[in-house]
Amino acid sequence: MTRKQKRLALIASGAVVVSLAVGLVMFALRDNIVFFYSPTELAEKPATNGARLRIGGLVKPASLDRQGDQTVRFTVTDMKHDVAVTYTGLLPDLFREGQGVVAEGALRPDGVFHADSVLAKHDERYMPREVADALKKQGVWQEEGKSEGKPSAIPAQTAPQGAQAY
């Protein structure tokens, strides 16, 4: 073999090794890749039933339904479309109606999203960019943090109603 052929064989074998390594990494991560959808995107382009994905938006007011066995049903909306969500477990402390939420799980054949985990929006820094952009585009984005450093006009309640402090 000439020098040129040896160099070409070395480059070709290096490319094969790199391609094989990339293929193995992609194969190992295939279960960890989760696609993100808004309710509108999910309505326009339905995901495959059982495929892992994330949905994000606002918890629709008056949609929260708590069952006795820690099962919670609620609706995620982006003000255009809604997605019914079922979750079993403890919800984050910041979870409430009208707030931003991201749920990760799978869409069942009946159209209900079964969430394995639910993340509540803390403030706009933690909202996925896609959700924030969709909400801003629809005019329902709520700016937070405008009153930082200012005391609240409503005093904090220190005792339950009806209790007397001694």
Swiss-Prot record:
Keywords annotated in UniProt: Cell inner membrane, Cell membrane, Cytochrome c-type biogenesis, Heme, Iron, Membrane, Metal-binding, Signal-anchor, Transmembrane, Transmembrane helix
Cytoplasmic compartment spans: 1-7
Superkingdom of origin organism: Bacteria
Ranges where the record places region Disordered: 139-166
Periplasmic compartment segments: 29-166
Positions of transmembrane segments: 8-28
GO BP, sorted A to Z: cytochrome complex assembly
Chief location category: membrane
Binding site for heme: 122, 126
Keyword Ribonucleoprotein in record: no
Molecular-function GO terms, alphabetical: heme binding; metal ion binding
Compartments where found: Cell inner membrane
This protein's GO CC annotations: plasma membrane
Pfam families from the UniProt entry: CcmE (PF03100)
Membrane-protein topology: Single-pass type II membrane protein
Keyword Transmembrane helix listed: yes
HAMAP family for this protein: CcmE (MF_01959)
PANTHER family linked: CYTOCHROME C-TYPE BIOGENESIS PROTEIN CCME HOMOLOG, MITOCHONDRIAL (PTHR34128:SF2)
Annotated family: Belongs to the CcmE/CycJ family.
Its job: Heme chaperone required for the biogenesis of c-type cytochromes. Transiently binds heme delivered by CcmC and transfers the heme to apo-cytochromes in a process facilitated by CcmF and CcmH.
Protein name per UniProt: Cytochrome c-type biogenesis protein CcmE
Gene this chain is encoded by: ccmE
